[in-house]
């Protein structure tokens, strides 16, 4: 180690080796005193912070290195500590991470002739060494900040200041040094020594032309070296052969040609064209081909409206004639409401050098970015089905807009999920179609607070490759790097395709009203395709006539209505598809067997309660396991946790995979599930449901990150790709499900009607009024019922263990795939009355209408109370206390589709009814009252037109529940009293 004081900032390092730390005698006496006090102060801090002892040196050093690269990447307390470190000799600059400097010194040390040698004065050697270090600092500066001077903007409107760190004079290197030879250190171009002029020129070619690479924020040195080794040898400009360059021109011609064709044939019709960003099409083409060469079998794409029609026709091979029919408003022969053409999904198979690949473009709403986690979920399901844990066979590619990528919170959530156990997919290729404007907003100070729209990706240390979309070969190069990086490191990577929007937000919009200067420039711009054609003609790759013929040939194909993707497979391999035909054409009333033989229940019960030898279970959990053993033996009534877990066990035993995610699902928010046991000695875990049977399907249970929106969207995507399994998302409290309201509204309840997409996702939403206040009482049942129509979803409120057992099994065993919204209990999980017997699992099925266990004689009943959920047990307690044999209480366990026939059958048993009441815990404007009363009134009218349905419940309220226990108790008493007296 050099005994020197290093005084540095992020990219500038000055090493003053004149003052050894061991000898401060050269300093003036006052300075020596100040230095001693400073050292004494530092030592006092060190002694007060025991975590800074020598044994932790490597750890602290690594933290400091990380802090220097990205201060936000270290814990707040460490960041605060590092911020307060004193300067040396009053120098105010910040340190630079020494790992990169050490690399440079290693390279220098390998060639001794550039160190001090005999015959050279010592002062000259020291001066040369200082300059050499400054050159290495300059190299490092280009790697860190070269992207800030890259020529990324096709419009030339970016107002970017010069980066002083990239000027050799900043590093005290002058014009006189330009022809001197210096060690190149870890540079990957040229020889070991080069003239400074050539070093700077090479660095500018690599980092400051059409590509701006951000990768130095990545902590992993292997990744940084990987990018340097890819970019520097070719100066970010590989020489592509003429065949590749012609193919690029053909793809650009297709992208531009389709937009021109649609613009002339359907003027003024919205299509959200790709004009200005045509390089996206060759980018996608290369990604698909390169993924195929790595063994990919499936690629799932997600994107918003911009350029979607172009991708459908020119990438996925949709027949142009079908697109023209949509433009002309011809209704296709399908059911449902349909959706606009720029929301439609599509799938096809294309051929690559590595074999056939299935492409699927996800359907999406106008809610930008919400499709991203949907795509990730679909990919994860495909990887699970293919036993592809590394993500080689199934690849996600997601396209974004610059405004939405910077503005939508679900982008952050999706990135945060990317490296977790439950949601990782082995890396995603993100392409930002950065046309520099969001509808009418283009000023950076309005659109974001960050330098780039892509800065959010730095939170997971994703490399970001900015590229000028008017340079197709640069786009090709970053595309190849991106797919290679994903294959090598299994992480996300971002391509920032800096382009422009030639027209308005849509084709009927005039953009000059809000962006006059931008669109004055755009009107004068030559298209990307024509720029590249001119370049190829100038380079002698093609002639002008050949360039024109490529354009004419594409237009002829469109006129004929032929497929324009040459790699499209006309007779695709069906093994690459998921077969949904068994689930088509069935009604929700379709029957299925959900009961299970007693011997099977007992066998599975033993497996569920088996704890490995030496596994130390926490005391309360041990009691739960012991009780479950007794339940299996019939010695105890079964509770909710047993009924639910047994449903999972029986489905696994019958060959159905299961996936459960959500916050705290391993244990369950209310400590009822305990599907994951934790060893109290070493923290190891045991999941009995993973050991139900030999060769059983996969059981996955993951505690999710604290997100509702992205996680529910992920599970929606998963369930639309996994019809044979049970996919469950559970809210920590049902109240929090509305954090994913976009997913519920745009996908879950309307996806089948808009797009024909089947989905069997199950939502478990804890709900119940127990005095816990307005944020921990309501799953907003009324919202799901208000969204219910055309048998789009199921809304169930099970109140017994056997009901949840049959409900979950029915969701998989019935040949129907509809979302299930299950309003689940909290206090009922341990309620002495909310139990079932083993016989209830071995016979019967899910009952949509459920009477009391011991009902009153129908001939005596004059009052019928209809209800759902927990309030039933309050009503039952009151009935028993008052010995009201004239009252019958009936639970409607499925509120949608409403079981009118089953209610009719029950009503037919009661001929002497005088009063019928609907009782609910929720306020009148919430719960089931407004959305379900007409169903109940219709049933009553069929039974006896004179009967009138009355309401017993809380008064209408702006909040779901009150926050005071005393008020809650009074309200609860009143609504129960009303049910019996009104």
Model-identified regions with their sequence ranges:
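Subset of Sec-pathway N-terminal targeting signals
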Residues: 43-92
């Amino acid at each position: 180690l050099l005994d020197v004081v290093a005084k540095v900032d992020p990219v500038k390092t000055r090493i003053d080796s004149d003052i050894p730390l061991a000898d401060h005698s050269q300093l003036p006496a006052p300075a020596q005193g100040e230095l001693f006090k400073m050292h004494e102060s530092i030592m006092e801090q060190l002694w007060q912070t025991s975590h800074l002892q020598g044994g932790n040196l490597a750890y602290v050093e690594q933290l400091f290195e990380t802090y220097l690269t990205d201060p936000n990447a270290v814990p707040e307390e460490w960041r605060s500590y590092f911020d307060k470190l004193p300067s040396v000799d009053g120098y105010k600059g910040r340190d630079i991470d020494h790992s990169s400097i050490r690399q440079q010194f290693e390279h220098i040390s390998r060639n001794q002739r550039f160190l001090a040698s005999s015959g050279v004065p010592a002062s000259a050697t020291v001066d040369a060494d200082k300059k050499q270090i400054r050159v290495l600092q300059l190299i490092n500066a280009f790697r860190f900040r070269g992207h800030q001077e890259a020529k990324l903007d096709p419009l030339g409107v970016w107002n970017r200041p010069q980066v002083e760190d990239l000027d050799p004079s900043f590093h005290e290197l002058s014009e006189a040094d330009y022809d001197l030879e210096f060690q190149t250190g870890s540079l990957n171009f040229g020889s070991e020594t080069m003239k400074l002029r050539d070093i700077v020129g090479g660095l500018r070619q690599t980092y400051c032309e059409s590509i701006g690479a951000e990768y130095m924020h990545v902590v992993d040195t292997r990744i940084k070296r990987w990018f340097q080794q890819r970019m520097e040898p070719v100066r970010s400009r590989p020489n592509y052969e003429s065949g590749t360059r012609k193919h690029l021109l053909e793809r650009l011609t297709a992208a531009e040609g389709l937009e021109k064709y649609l613009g002339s044939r359907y003027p003024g019709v919205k299509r959200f064209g790709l004009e200005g960003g045509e390089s996206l099409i060759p980018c996608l083409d290369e990604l698909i081909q390169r993924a195929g060469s790595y063994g990919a079998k499936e690629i799932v794409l997600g994107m918003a409206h911009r350029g979607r029609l172009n991708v459908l026709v020119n990438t996925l091979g949709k027949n142009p004639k079908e697109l023209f029919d949509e433009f002309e408003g011809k209704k296709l022969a399908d059911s449902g409401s349909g959706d606009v053409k720029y929301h439609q999904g599509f799938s096809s198979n294309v051929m690559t050098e590595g074999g056939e690949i299935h492409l699927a473009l996800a359907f999406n709403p106008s809610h930008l970015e919400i499709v991203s986690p949907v795509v990730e979920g679909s990919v994860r399901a495909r990887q699970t089905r293919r036993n592809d844990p590394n993500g080689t066979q199934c690849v996600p590619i997601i396209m974004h807009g610059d405004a939405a990528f910077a503005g939508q919170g679900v982008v952050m959530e999706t990135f945060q999920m990317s490296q977790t156990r439950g949601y990782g997919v082995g890396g995603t290729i993100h392409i930002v179609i950065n046309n520099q404007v969001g509808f009418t907003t283009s000023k950076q100070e309005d659109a974001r607070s960050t330098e780039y729209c892509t800065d959010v990706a730095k939170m997971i240390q994703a490399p970001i490759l900015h590229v000028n979309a008017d340079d197709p070969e640069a786009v090709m190069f970053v595309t190849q790097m991106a797919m290679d990086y994903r294959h090598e490191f299994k992480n996300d990577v971002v391509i920032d395709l800096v382009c422009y929007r030639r027209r308005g937000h849509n084709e009927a919009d005039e953009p000059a009203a809000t962006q006059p200067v931008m669109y004055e420039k755009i009107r004068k711009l030559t298209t990307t395709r024509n720029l590249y054609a001119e370049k190829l003609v100038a380079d002698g790759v093609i002639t002008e006539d050949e360039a024109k013929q490529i354009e004419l040939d594409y237009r002829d194909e469109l006129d004929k209505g032929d497929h324009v993707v040459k790699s499209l497979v006309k007779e695709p391999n069906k093994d690459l598809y998921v077969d949904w035909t068994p689930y088509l054409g069935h009604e929700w009333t379709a029957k299925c067997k959900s009961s299970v033989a007693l011997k099977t229940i007992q066998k599975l019960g033993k497996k569920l309660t088996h704890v490995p030898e030496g596994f130390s279970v926490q005391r309360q959990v041990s009691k739960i396991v012991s009780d479950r053993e007794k339940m299996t033996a019939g010695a105890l009534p079964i509770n909710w946790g047993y009924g639910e877990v047994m449903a999972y066990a029986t489905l696994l035993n019958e060959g159905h995979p299961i996936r459960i995610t959500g916050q705290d699902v391993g244990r369950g928010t209310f400590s009822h599930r305990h599907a994951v046991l934790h060893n109290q000695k070493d923290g190891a875990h045991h999941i009995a449901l993973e050991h139900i049977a030999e060769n059983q399907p996969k059981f996955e249970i993951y505690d999710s990150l604290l997100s509702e929106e992205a996680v529910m969207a992920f599970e929606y995507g998963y369930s639309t790709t996994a019809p044979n399994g049970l996919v469950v998302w559970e809210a920590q409290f049902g109240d929090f499900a509305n954090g994913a309201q976009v997913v519920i509204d745009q996908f879950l309840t309307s996806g089948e009607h808009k797009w024909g997409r089947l989905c069997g996702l199950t939502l478990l939403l804890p709900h119940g009024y127990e005095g816990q206040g307005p944020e921990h009482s309501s799953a907003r049942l009324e919202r799901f019922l208000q969204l219910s129509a055309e048998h789009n979803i199921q809304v169930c409120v099970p109140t017994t263990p056997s009901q949840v057992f049959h409900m979950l099994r029915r969701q998989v065993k019935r040949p129907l795939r509809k979302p299930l919204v299950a309003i689940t209990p909290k206090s009922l999980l341990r309620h002495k009355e909310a139990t079932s017997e083993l016989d209830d699992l071995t016979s019967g099925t899910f009952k949509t209408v459920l009477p009391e266990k011991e009902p009153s004689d129908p001939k005596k009943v004059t009052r019928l109370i209809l209800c759902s959920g927990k309030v039933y047990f309050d009503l039952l307690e009151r009935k028993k206390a008052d010995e009201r044999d004239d009252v019958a209480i009936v639970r409607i366990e499925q509120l949608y589709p409403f079981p009118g026939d089953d209610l009719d059958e029950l009503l037919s048993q009661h001929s002497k009814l005088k009063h019928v009441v609907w009782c609910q815990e929720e306020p009148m404007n919430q719960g089931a009252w407004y959305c379900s009363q007409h169903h109940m009134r219709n049933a009553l009218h069929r039974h006896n037109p004179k009967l009138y349905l009355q309401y017993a419940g809380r008064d209408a309220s702006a909040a779901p529940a009150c926050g005071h226990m005393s008020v809650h108790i009074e309200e609860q008493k009143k609504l129960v009293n009303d049910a019996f007296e009104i």
